[in-house]
């Protein structure tokens, strides 16, 4: 059975890999010259199931107003003429209730923890190397109020059985020695020891090589134009003026997925949240991060690779604008310079931006659609790297009609009101260990 995967970011590539392992004949098509060249290229580098939470949360609307008034704001909104921007923001606001937050977070944590386990298994089985570290994530609080508010997050962690440590200043210096000289500006920290880090683009590149060894064909530099359908079935994809056909189709085009779905009558509320990153060569390894740091004040992650520091964050609701805003670079340089003033050479840093495909409820869209042979794997927001392996494996199981290892409930597009008359509902296997 032939499967055509549209998109070769970390989501499309993991989908292709697990489909090939399941015995499918897989072809991946992308407009870029290689895998992982868009949103997967220079993200923050975190694999953080413990921090899998929707942006839509109680209190966020008020926080957003305050953020918009700050010079180094983690959020910016640029009005466009696109009605989808306003519809998406309205849907997100409707999800900022305690009940919806709890439902959405459970879905995200379920998939994220499974995905981390799949990544661990993949690393053991294949030896794939991607500058990965399994040294946890440390969330820094600059104020006592932030530290006090962490009690709500800790309650959720305890309920989910996620290990954690609450650190004082001495504890921060113990797990991140390079911060010893700046602990005076910190009130405390929350550490999740089971979180991981790694270069997402490097992982995607090497997994694609392994997929090729399994028979996957990658076709680059090809423009995906539109999907053709007849009744409840996709009959082909127009690629550079040629109609390509397969038995099953997987749409993994991130923020661009809705553009192909809309003509089919499928509404996918996936909207781009623009993020930025700075990649800094390490000048003094002893003064660089050990793993990943999250700065709660600025909503920025600072991650250690082998010889580089990746500083990533921000959220701009600005449509598909990919221009580089120098003020965002200034903010990232300020934060890394504040915490790790001797760690890296900012004069040699590279600046990047990407579009995170985000749903209003934070949960990605993974699974079947109203069209019987079309499947989606998109909308992972800031957690594409965290959720990639689990999403790819879950999707492959669903397409193969195999019993998945976790429940797929609430993950497909039917939660937005799209009918699922032809979706295959498969009971999950016993809880994944």
Swiss-Prot record:
GO cellular component annotations of the record: cytoplasm; plasma membrane
Pfam families for this protein: DAO
EC assignment: 1.4.99.-
Transmembrane segments annotated in the record for this chain: none
Entry keywords, A to Z: FAD, Flavoprotein, Oxidoreductase
Recorded superkingdom: Bacteria
Binding site for FAD: 3-17
Recorded GO MF terms: D-amino-acid dehydrogenase activity
Gene3D superfamilies, A to Z: D-Amino Acid Oxidase, subunit A, domain 2, FAD/NAD(P)-binding domain
SUPFAM superfamilies per the UniProt record, alphabetical: FAD-linked reductases, C-terminal domain, FAD/NAD(P)-binding domain
Cofactor: FAD
Catalytic activity: a D-alpha-amino acid + A + H2O = a 2-oxocarboxylate + AH2 + NH4(+)
Keyword Hydrolase: no
Single biological process term from Gene Ontology: D-alanine catabolic process
KW Transcription regulation (keyword) present: no
Function: Oxidative deamination of D-amino acids.
Family: Belongs to the DadA oxidoreductase family.
Protein name, UniProt field: D-amino acid dehydrogenase
Source organism (scientific name): Pseudomonas syringae pv. tomato (strain ATCC BAA-871 / DC3000)
Lineage: Bacteria, Pseudomonadati, Pseudomonadota, Gammaproteobacteria, Pseudomonadales
Primary gene name: dadA
């Amino acid at each position: 059975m032939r499967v055509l995967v549209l998109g070769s970011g970390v989501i499309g590539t993991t989908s292709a890999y697990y489909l090939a392992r399941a015995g499918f004949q897989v072809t991946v098509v992308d407009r870029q010259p290689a895998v992982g060249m868009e949103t997967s290229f220079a993200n923050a580098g975190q694999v953080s199931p413990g921090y899998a939470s929707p942006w839509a949360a109680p209190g966020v609307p008020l926080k957003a107003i305050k953020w918009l008034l700050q010079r180094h704001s983690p959020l910016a909104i640029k009005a466009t003429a696109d009605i989808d921007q306003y519809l998406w923001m309205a849907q997100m606001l409707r999800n900022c209730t305690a009940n919806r937050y709890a439902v959405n977070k459970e879905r995200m944590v379920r998939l994220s923890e499974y995905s981390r386990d799949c990544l661990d298994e993949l690393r053991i089985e294949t030896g794939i190397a991607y500058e990965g570290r399994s040294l946890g994530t440390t969330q820094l609080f600059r104020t006592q109020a932030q530290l006090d508010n962490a009690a709500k997050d800790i309650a959720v962690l305890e309920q989910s059985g996620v290990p954690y440590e609450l650190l004082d200043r001495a504890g921060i210096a113990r797990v991140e020695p390079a911060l010893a000289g700046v602990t005076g500006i910190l009130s405390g920290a929350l550490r999740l020891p089971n979180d991981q880090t790694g270069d997402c683009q490097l992982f995607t590149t090497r997994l694609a090589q392994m997929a090729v060894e399994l028979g996957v064909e990658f076709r680059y530099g090809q423009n995906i134009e539109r999907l053709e359908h007849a009744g409840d079935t996709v009959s082909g994809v127009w690629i550079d003026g040629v109609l390509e056909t397969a038995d099953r189709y997987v749409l993994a085009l991130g923020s661009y997925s809705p553009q192909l779905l809309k003509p089919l009558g499928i509404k996918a509320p996936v909207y781009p949240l623009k993020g930025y990153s700075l990649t800094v060569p390490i000048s003094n390894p002893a003064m660089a991060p050990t793993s990943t740091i999250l700065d709660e004040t600025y909503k920025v992650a600072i991650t250690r690779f082998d010889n580089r520091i990746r500083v990533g964050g921000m959220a701009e609701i600005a449509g598909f604008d990919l221009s580089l805003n120098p003020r965002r670079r200034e903010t990232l340089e300020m934060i890394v310079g504040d915490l790790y003033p001797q760690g890296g050479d900012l004069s040699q840093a590279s600046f990047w931006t990407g579009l995170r495909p985000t749903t209003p409820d934070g949960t990605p869209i993974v699974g079947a659609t109203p069209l019987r042979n079309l499947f989606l794997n998109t909308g992972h927001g800031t957690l594409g790297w965290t959720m990639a392996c689990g999403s790819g494996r879950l999707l492959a199981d669903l397409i193969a009609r195999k019993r998945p290892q976790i429940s797929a409930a609430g993950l497909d597009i039917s939660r937005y009101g799209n009918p699922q008359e032809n979706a295959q509902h498969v009971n999950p296997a016993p809880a994944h260990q």
